[in-house]
Amino acid sequence: MIIMNYILMDLEWNQASDEKTKLANELLFEIIEIGAVKLNDKKHQIDSFHELIKPQVFHRMNQVTGELIHIQMEQLSNCRSFEEVAGDFLKWCGEDYVFCTWGGADLTELQRNMEYYHMSSLSSGPLKYYDIQKLFSIAYEDRKTRRSLKYAVDYLEIEQDIAFHRADSDAYYTAKVMSHFYNPALFDNYSFDTYQLPKSRADEVHAIFENYEKYISRPFPDKLTAMQDKEVISTRCFLCGANTKRRIPWFSVNNGKHYYTVVCCKTHGYLKGKIRMRKSVRDDCIYVVKTLKSIDENGVTDILKRKQQTREVRKERRHRL
């Protein structure tokens, strides 16, 4: 049996202090601090990691960043490079582990910085991880609201014995919040970082959760090409695999950023399909995140209303022209 550790990671990064510097560099955010807590499979802390990093891209601290994290450039001048620190950090993580972060930005920026310095990729496709911010919402709120780490710490009445907004302290508090997740089923709600996209159709993600399915596509050159792909617009029932009958055809909202449909499975009833068009963070390609979710009659009515509202908005725009 594989024993997997949890790596509760937090990063702090600097950015350009002016527009000229920003335009002159392809790296938007330069990581200057890595903090992490390692938990075993029983969620007990077994180790920690913390190190500051010497900047190689931005040599002035962005004013807002400096005021938030209270790090001066002088503190970083004798530190090791990103390649050295990140390399040691990944060795420290070990072989069998899963990243846990507050929100999804840290994993994206870690991989962006690694690619900038020509380090090996963390994965060859979407990377499974736990978004503790999302899990907090599922455990204690409405699944949709996203709170700050400070809010969660206050809500759970966790002792605040160190300051926030440093990589080591925020990783520590994230681990403390995670220790208040008592239902094992909560950890069925994993997330995917999409810095690395599926390379081919065979690599695409099909993940089934309690009451919905998530699909992450390979890259496409544009939205039209994506919507012509059979797998993108497929609506097989995720519970039994049966073909479904279309009730509301795919229609777009938000200038083609989102698409909706309603289908019906003979066995499991109505399903709502939603397509989100996402732009790759690495190039100009787009990819699709599609969800299929069980709904009732009220859910069908909501989609019909949305479709009608979209028609009315488009009609009004045409009338203005």
Language model region names:
Residues E26, D41, R143, M227-K230, ...:
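Generic marker of residues within folded, mature protein domains
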Residues H180-L321:
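Acidic two-metal-ion nuclease catalytic site recognized across multiple nuclease folds
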Residues L27-I34, K38-I69, C93-S217, R282-V288:
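Metal-dependent phosphoesterase core characteristic of DEDDh/y 3'-5' exonuclease domains
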Residues V85, Y172, G256:
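Short Asp/Glu-rich motifs
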Residues E19-L23, L149-K150, P219-P221:
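Short secondary-structure boundary micro-motifs
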